[in-house]
C-alpha cells in the first residue's frame, strides 16, 4: 500500500499519547536552524518538561511525516527509559511505514 503523504500529514494530531497518562503537545514552527553540535539542519524537536513535539512547517509532506515519527520515537525513548541513540531513532523512524502497514493488515484494511 502506497502512503498518501499529504493525508498522513493532515492527520497529525495536536496532541499525542505515549503512555496512558503521558501526552505531548504537537506544535508547528518555521524557526529551525542548523545544529552546530550534530552538523545537521533541525526539522523537529522533542522537549520533556513540558512534553512538547515541534515540527517544521516548511517541510514537504513525506519529510514532515518522517520528522513526526522521529520525534515521537524520541518521546517513547524518554518515557519508557529506552535511552535510544540518535542512530537507533533514525533506524526506527525508517520502519514506521512498515509498522503502519502491519497495523492496517491486522485491522483488515490491507490485503
Predicted ranges, named:
Residues 66-78:
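Active-site recognition of the HExxH zinc-binding catalytic motif
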Residues 101-105:
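Short secondary-structure capping/junction motifs at helix and strand boundaries
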Residues 5-62, 78-100, 111:
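Active-site scaffold of zinc-dependent metalloenzymes
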Residues 1-2, 107-111:
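Short intrinsically disordered terminal tails
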Amino acid at each position: 500500500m502506497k502512503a498518501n503523504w499529504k493525508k498522513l500529514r493532515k492527520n497529525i494530531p495536536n496532541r499525542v499519547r505515549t503512555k496512558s497518562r503521558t501526552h505531548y503537545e504537537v506544535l508547528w514552527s518555521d524557526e529551525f536552524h542548523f545544529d552546530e553540535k550534530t552538523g545537521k539542519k533541525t526539522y523537529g524537536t522533542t522537549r520533556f518538561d513540558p512534553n512538547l513535539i515541534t515540527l517544521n512547517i516548511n517541510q514537504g509532506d513525506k519529510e514532515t511525516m518522517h520528522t513526526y515519527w522521529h520525534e515521537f520515537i524520541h518521546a517513547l525513548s524518554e518515557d519508557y527509559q529506552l535511552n535510544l541513540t540518535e542512530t537507533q531513532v533514525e533506524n526506527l523512524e525508517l520502519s514506521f511505514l512498515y509498522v503502519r502497514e502491519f497495523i492496517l493488515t491486522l485491522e483488515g484494511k490491507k490485503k
